[in-house]
Amino acid sequence: MRRNFDPDDYALVVKLRADPPRPWRWEIYCAGKRLPIEHSEAFFETRGAANKAGKQALSQLIAKLSV
């Protein structure tokens, strides 16, 4: 595990960033950073779909950073 790594410093946010029919995207933020460190390339029809994909991306990021 990386030194000073805390998974609780990373948060998933789903935001309305475009016009319908696919307005939703997920973004991952790190504590202390103003801009997202990752975001979805694709937009989603529903907030729920973006949230589900974002949770998977956050899990993968945390797994990668914790090695």
Label the predicted regions.
Residues 1-25:
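Short N-terminal "domain-start" leader segments
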Residues 16-17, 40, 65:
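Compositionally biased, intrinsically disordered low-complexity segments
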Residues 21-23, 35, 51:
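A broad, structure-centric signal for solvent-exposed, well-ordered loop/edge residues
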Residues 35-49:
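A short, exposed loop/beta-hairpin motif centered on an aromatic-Gly-Thr core
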Residues 46, 50-58:
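Acidic helix/loop or adjacent segment enriched in Glu/Asp that either coordinates divalent metal
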Residues 56-67:
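Short arginine-rich
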